[in-house]
Every structure is written in structure tokens, then in C-alpha cells.
Amino acid sequence: MNPQLNNPNLPIYMDYQATTPLDPRVMEAMLPYFTTKFGNPHSRSHSFGWEAENAVEEARSRVARLIGADTKEIIFTSGATESNNLAIKGIAKFYGNKKNHIITVVSEHKCVLDACRHLEQEGIKITYLPIKPNGIIDLETLKNAITDQTMLVSVMAVNNEIGVVQPLKEIGKICRERGVFFHSDIAQGFGKIPIDVNEFNIDLASISGHKIYGPKGIGALYVRKKPRVRVTPLINGGGQERGMRSGTLPTPLIVGLGMAAEIAYSVMEKDTKHVNYLFDRFLNNIHNRISEVYLNGDKNQRYKGNINLSFAGVEGESIILAIKDLAVSSGSACTSASLEPSYVLRSMGIGEELAHTSIRFGIGRFTTEQEVDYAVDLICSKIDKLRELSPLWEMVQEGIDLKKIKWATH
């Protein structure tokens, strides 16, 4: 079928891991707090302040409910990057005189890896756990990495590039048994997969508003109260957020995050069914029409809104240019500006050639069946054309192992 026939509104948004569109119900909930309900939630002497404070506390309880936390355990931040920094650096600063070791994973989000590298310069020892070819960590390797000096294990819930879901419950059990704090960057999983901080023994969890159809510039950090977890603040000031994060709270953004969490709580099952159906339709139709396409990351232990594919014999950059009617990404949005192959794919043992051909397709709440079908038609027709032009594809067809070729450097 010619993709130009039956085309939906173009371009089609398929980059839901980078950000999500604002749910109209979220926008509606936020608007009054930009206009008539403009009070400072920390003003205690008049109704404008009380009104804002009530709205903030309601949002806090909505965020808490989605992960089975207590309302008082939610600290509002500017987003998951700040939450990750506060969790990792905050623990290191508070407990660093007693212990000096942190464990994380090679495939974590860049802000976690960079926070850890920063701490290495301050004398903290960091262990970067490898991942298996399916993108998931090995629990025995984690057990063996923990020492009596380990203060924190930081493992994300859902990987932003390949969508795999790490075994949080098992990791939490290991950490609790060994007396080590467990932090998880749950930005890509919050509101999309069931996460219960008590069942999973999570001590700190980082949340982002704009990954769950909420506004940008707002996030949260869950900090366990029992047994109590202490973090040294990164920002000093008026002592807001139980002293962990000073600064006037942005009421409209917090109301938006709360509403997004409330919606996710009620429609998570429906969203999951929708995304799983579109994942199967997208993947099966592509596999039926073109060969040598590989799904990166475990097929079952993943959030299926993330479809990271490698197309053998074609450069990822040329695919993105060819399918410009689809808004997609080659890796995480923070690093897709660099032409280096993804460090996440490389850490799974995927060769440089195949890593360079990978594209991340993101589907979500507002993706339609028509958009998925259009995307499949467009991708298949363009990949066929690009492969006809590709000397690499010719070599693959002739059975030449690209890994064994010695490339000339200019």
C-alpha cells in the first residue's frame, strides 16, 4: 500500500519516551492555578495560600497513592534529573562518612551515571553492574557486588532506550536483607507498570511529570520514612519539602503532576492493553514484511510502549531522515544529538554496526491503530529502498560477517 493513501495527521508522534503530550484533563486542572488561584502554598495567613496548599497536598497524595507510598514521603522537585541527583548525592553526603560504596548499572540514564561519576571524584567507590544480552541485570552479580561498605544500590525500573523492566522486587529483597538502601529511577515506569514501594522494598524513587502526560519542569522523589532514609539537600533555603528541597513550590505544575497521576491510577490497565495491542501489531507487521529486523531488549520483560529496533544494513540516521513523517529517536533524547552508537546497546553486547542502525519507536495513550499501520507501511517501503542503495546490505546478503571486516580510518 502507498503510505500517502489514508494518511493520518502528519507528522506522527512516536517518541513517547522523550516526552508525552499533555493530557487535556491535566491542562484543565492546572489552568485555575495560573489565573485566579495564584497563591503561594507557603503563605499561612490568608485564603489564597491555604487554597494553594490544599491543592499541593491533594496532588502529593495522588502521586503517593500510585506507588503505595505515604503522602509525607513525596518530595516535589523539578524533574527526574534533580530527583536522581538528590537521591544519589544526598545519600552519599549523609552516609558517606560511614560507608563509601555505591552500586549502579551500566545502562542507567545519563543523569544517574553522571551523578555517580561526580561522586567518584569525591572518593566514593562506584560499581557499574553489567547487563545480560537481553538488557536485564544478573541478580547473583548484584549479590556478589555488595560489601559491608555499600550504602546504596541504584537500578532503574524501565530503561528509557530499550524499555526492559528490571526485577525490582528481587533487587529490593536483596538490598533489604543486606541493609543497603535501594534507589530506583522509575521515571519511565511510574503510571505505566505497577510499582509498590513497600512490596519492592524501594527506599528512594525518582519521578517525572512529563513522562506520564503531565507538565515539564516538575517531578518528585519518594523518600522512605520507615525505616527512615536521610538525604542531605542539594538546595538550601526556606526549608520547604521537609527541609530536603527548598524553594517556593510551583502550584500549577504540581496540580498537573497530581492530575496525571490520578488519571494513570484509573486507566493504567486500559493504557497497558492499548499499548500491548499496538506493540504486537507494529512488530508483527514489520517482521512479516522485512527481514533482519531485531528487537533490542527482552521481548516479554519490558514496557511495550518502547520498541527499539535495529535494521541490519542501514544507518539509523538515514532511516530517521527517510521516515521524517514519524517523530522517532535513535537513543535517548538527551544523547541523540551525538552520533555515537548508544552506550546502552553496546553494553548489551550489540556490535557497533547494528547499534548504529537502531531506532526507538515510542507508543502511548494517544497513539492510534491508523498511525501504527501508516508507520509500518512507511518504514517498510523506506527500508527496502535504503537497503537497495546500501553496500552493507549487499555484503550481509552475500553472507559476509560485518564484524570481521577491517574498516579503513581516514
Curated annotation (Swiss-Prot):
Chemical reaction(s) catalysed: (sulfur carrier)-H + L-cysteine = (sulfur carrier)-SH + L-alanine
N6-(pyridoxal phosphate)lysine, modified sites: 211
Annotated source species: Rickettsia felis (strain ATCC VR-1525 / URRWXCal2) (Rickettsia azadi)
Predominant localisation class: cytoplasm
Full protein name: Cysteine desulfurase IscS
NCBIfam families in alphabetical order: IscS, PRK02948.1, PRK14012.1
Self-association state and partner proteins as the record states: Homodimer. Forms a heterotetramer with IscU, interacts with other sulfur acceptors.
Residues noted as binding pyridoxal 5'-phosphate in the record, renumbered to the chain: 80-81, 160, 188, 208-210, 248
Keyword Iron attached: yes
